[in-house]
Swiss-Prot record:
Catalytic activity, EC: 6.1.1.11
Source organism per UniProt: Chlorobium limicola (strain DSM 245 / NBRC 103803 / 6330)
Gene that produces this protein: serS
Protein name: Serine--tRNA ligase
Function of the molecule: Catalyzes the attachment of serine to tRNA(Ser). Is also able to aminoacylate tRNA(Sec) with serine, to form the misacylated tRNA L-seryl-tRNA(Sec), which will be further converted into selenocysteinyl-tRNA(Sec).
Compartments in which it is found: Cytoplasm
GO cellular component, one term: cytoplasm
Taxonomic lineage: Bacteria, Pseudomonadati, Chlorobiota, Chlorobiia, Chlorobiales
Enzyme class: ligase
């Protein structure tokens, strides 16, 4: 959530940001917001004046009763009128603050000055392409769904029978390979990169979704358990970032770095017509998430570290990938800057997104009221929050299976995973 003071002082910048994000329809809401803000500040001043008057009248009544200087009926009547006006003012103020918050919750975040202006994914900037791995794929390739079926390690048909399309089943060595990927990534991030492991709830309340920015703007993408007021998490970012909601963090504890595995659930509303084969678009998938809480002045250094930690997984697995800096028209509403990491699918002949690494500055922390004191006596400030996929296994599995296939239709297990799988080949 943006600071109302920032919006008040930088209306032109906020308008330009909305235009660069292709959200021109939201621009009138800024003027509406500032109009409500003016009303709120005027009402606060009026309420303060009335409360000061009430205090003076109360003292006058007390003095008159103490001195016996005369009847206080007139002043008591005035006091009742002032009290009624204060109550009415408080009700109006509460309604104004609710209207202001409703708009603030839907406005997107600022954009970092390094984010390129663009209208679509075609204008994202390719920062890096990592290849150089020796894969002799000079034979007719099977895609991941064909490999999964022929090797008996993936069962999309039975998954669809149980939960519908987009709910895959891993079987036998496929299940072991998936679990090995998760454990390898968690071990790398905790033992190698210094993250503390978290195993979070997979169901959260609405306040948690609101805190990280999925609610209300992306409510249609979330699976809902209405009778219990709970929601299936779209990413571990939601429960893990909310661990410190409403807390004053100790500056000495910053930065805080968490790594968490979770299943992720997404309705993917509006995906009709897109390629939904196999793992290309699913409703449930597994992901290891990196989450950080930092001082504001070091958050962009932390973003680069998160990106490097995600890349380290791919380098260890010897998966070809590229890094994109997202443009203003493609970046998520909550992020100020975002890198996407895409893995190469040789059978599909295209890149697939496997990780997003984002800085949110104080956008989420303000929604969740997560603060710290730079030193013992200073005024509290909001922390900056960041996260990155480290990584999502579904798209990663596509690239891993397709790159490591043999002409005989077998799959060689990457060397770093063999201590986890207990086998070096599937098939």
């Amino acid at each position: 959530m943006l600071d109302i003071t920032y919006i008040r002082q930088n209306q032109d910048d906020v308008t330009a940001m909305l235009r660069n994000r292709l959200l021109e329809s939201e621009i009138p809401r800024v003027a509406e917001l500032l109009g409500l803000d003016r009303q709120r500040r005027e009402l606060v001043q009026q309420a303060d004046d009335m409360k000061a008057l009430r205090n003076r009248v109360s003292r006058d009544i007390a003095d008159m009763k103490k001195s016996g200087s005369g009847p206080a009926d007139e002043l008591i009547g005035k006091m009742k009128s002032v009290a009624e006006n204060i109550a009415a003012s408080d009700t109006s103020l509460k309604n104004l603050e609710s209207a202001i918050e409703e708009i603030l919750l839907t406005l997107p975040n600022r954009l970092h000055n390094s984010v390129p202006v663009g209208k679509s994914a075609e204008e994202n900037v390719i920062l890096k392409e990592q290849g150089g791995f020796d894969y002799p794929l000079d034979f007719p390739l099977k895609n991941h769904t064909e490999l999964g079926k022929s090797l008996g390690i993936l069962d999309f048909e039975r998954g669809a029978k149980v939960g519908g399309a987009g709910f895959p089943v891993y079987t036998g060595k496929g299940a072991r390979l998936e679990r090995s990927l998760i454990n390898f990534m968690l071990d790398t991030h905790t033992s190698g990169h210094g993250y503390t492991e978290i195993f979070p709830p997979f169901l959260v309340n609405r306040e948690s979704l609101r805190g990280t920015g999925q609610w209300p703007k992306f409510a249609d993408q979330v699976y809902t358990i209405e009778e219990d007021g709970l929601y299936a998490i779209p990413t571990a970012e939601v429960p893990v970032t909310n661990l410190h909601r409403g807390e004053m963090l100790d500056a000495a504890d910053l930065p805080i770095a968490y790594a968490a595995y979770s299943a992720c659930f997404r309705r993917e509303a509006g995906s009709y017509g897109k390629d939904t084969r196999g793992f290309l678009r699913v409703h449930q998938f597994n992901k290891v998430e990196m989450v950080r809480f930092t001082r504001p002045e070091v958050s962009y250094e932390a973003l680069e570290e998160i990106r490097q930690h995600a890349e380290a997984i791919l380098l260890a697995l010897k998966i070809p990938y590229r890094v994109l800096l997202l443009c203003s028209g493609d970046i998520s509403a909550n992020a100020t800057k975002c890198y996407d990491i895409e893995v190469w699918s040789p059978a599909e002949d295209k890149y697939l997104e496997a990780s997003s690494c984002s800085n949110f500055e104080d956008y989420q922390a303000r929604r969740m009221n997560i603060r710290y004191r730079p030193d013992g006596k200073s005024r509290p400030e909001f922390v900056h929050t960041l996260n990155g996929s480290g990584l999502a296994t579904s798209r990663l599995m596509v690239s891993l299976l397709e790159h490591n296939q043999t002409p005989e239709g077998k799959v060689i297990v990457p060397e770093v995973l063999r201590p986890y799988t207990g086998f070096d080949i599937i098939g």
